[in-house]
Design a protein with these regions (language model features):
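Structural motif corresponding to alpha-helix initiation and N-cap regions
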Residues: 11, 55-56
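Short solvent-exposed loop/turn micro-motifs enriched in small/polar/acidic residues
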Residues: 19-21, 33-35, 87, 132-133
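Charged, gly/pro-rich active-site loop segments
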Residues: 2-5, 75-151
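Extreme N-terminal tail/first-helix region
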Residues: 1-19
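Short beta-strand segments
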Residues: 21-54, 70
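Helix-adjacent hinge/juxtasegments
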Residues: 51, 57-79, 85
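Broad gene-expression machinery/nucleic-acid interaction feature
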Residues: 23, 36-38, 67, 91, ...
């Protein structure tokens, strides 16, 4: 990282940012081009957990190539200045990479989907079986994390 004074290396701080963020942007490989989608996510230990419909471009790409990159940010604010070129941003961001795995086990899918319920404040309780069956759950095994902050 060019600006070492802005680098976040503390693992606990990186995961605090991940827990605070509500949306991640997941980048995948589509032939010779990147493909990026915004998603809600949950955390299971060190892993990101994503959910989706069982079909679509994202699912096709993940099945072809499970290598992914993701980004989250929190505390983003434009810092206005007297002149346009002096504007800045306040932020904390995490960029990570890893491998996507499809969760096929029904009980594990239900457990991971329950993490979304608790993360986003939906009423607790058993998930409808039809939702567990029709929802695709993807675990991203995080291999690398980097972080950056700007005051």
């Amino acid at each position: 990282m060019r600006r070492k004074e802005q680098e976040i290396t503390d693992r606990d701080e990186l995961y605090r940012i991940l827990r605070a963020a509500r949306v991640c942007r997941l980048a995948m490989v589509d032939g010779d081009r990147p493909y990026l989608v915004p998603l809600t996510f949950a955390l299971d230990g060190d892993d990101l957990v994503l959910h989706s419909a069982r079909a679509g471009r994202k699912i096709e790409l993940l099945r072809r190539n499970p290598a992914v990159c993701f980004e989250v940010e929190e505390g983003v604010e434009v810092m206005q200045a007297e002149t346009a070129c002096d504007f800045s941003m306040r932020f904390r961001t995490v960029i990570g990479s890893g491998e996507a795995e499809f969760v096929e086990d029904r009980a594990e899918r239900a457990r991971l989907l329950a993490l979304f319920v608790s993360r986003f404040g939906a009423p607790a309780g058993p998930l409808p079986e039809v939702e567990v069956q029709r929802t695709c759950v993807v675990r991203v095994r995080v291999r690398e994390l980097t972080g950056k902050r700007s005051p």
